[in-house]
């Protein structure tokens, strides 16, 4: 079976590499997140837009800062900001400290989408907790945090 994101479910195959399982779990969670966002009226949000939503400061951020934080190029972030701007999630405003620079800020719609996404991700985690048990989810969280710390250097 293939998910909408194109990820093939392989739960019946033995010895699937752990990184593959992690990718599949992430893909399923992200697919559910985006479907629920769309169901709630937040259209046009894609996975890659998280590079803006996750790294933007409450008071707004410069494009260069978003690029630095996300690890994307300034051009790539600029395109993502343009897409989000077209959907009404962000706006560009003059930077009070430098009139030549622009600050990217979440609009009210963008703030609502960010709050909705956080709530939906919490719902997904709670679903996992109900199915696996709170102790198992806490153990999974700790193990993943340790792997991330190990691999981040």
Which role does the model predict for each range below?
Residues 1-44:
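N-terminal leader segment of winged-helix/HTH proteins
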Residues 31-76, 153:
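N-terminal helix-turn-helix DNA-binding core of bacterial DNA-binding proteins
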Residues 64, 81-82:
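Short, hydrophobic-biased segments on the C-terminal half of alpha helices
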Residues 19, 53-54, 114:
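Hydrophobic residues on short alpha-helical segments
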Residues 3-6, 35, 82-145:
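Charged, amphipathic alpha-helical coiled-coil/dimerization segments
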Residues 24, 28, 57-58, 123, ...:
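Alpha-helical structural segments
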